[in-house]
């Protein structure tokens, strides 16, 4: 009987050890392949990569609506050149609640707005540039699309996110890397401090020339640190 109990305990111990060892072989967020790793080993390691709790929660949202709305809506262009007259932005029946309500009924869980695209036109009354809704005739320059969408998301219990283009074809300081990075961080700070909780921030890698013909070196680390500090 004692031998049987000893064998059972040994078996349980070995199984527990094997399970613990197996659990340790999972990788969270990222995995680094050793230089000597074979293709088979890389495939095996990649198959054991699991998301972080934050990444898993993002996947569970399933559907996000990306609202590509801005001054290009009124010029009919995909990418503006930053020379648009703000007077062109004058929506007569903008109804953010109708947008969000429709998306909610369709099963979406988050709404993400292009607060600024490559043309540099801002959908909120930013202090960083005159190329914004504050210079438009919409609501006599007192309108704020970001604010209206944020309020609609609160009303319908939808998560809210913003897209802010690093490439800015209107900003004179674009291409002067330190100055423009500071300019961009000030815009990002406005969005992350004046509109409550922002559940997602989108950038992209577009890096064309600015109005001065120069390209910008983006300070991605500073951008991400700003997000982490404010949200």
Question: What residue spans do the PLM features occupy?
Answer:
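Mature catalytic domains of secreted/periplasmic carbohydrate-active enzymes
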Residues: 21-231
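Bacterial Sec-dependent N-terminal signal peptides
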Residues: 1-23
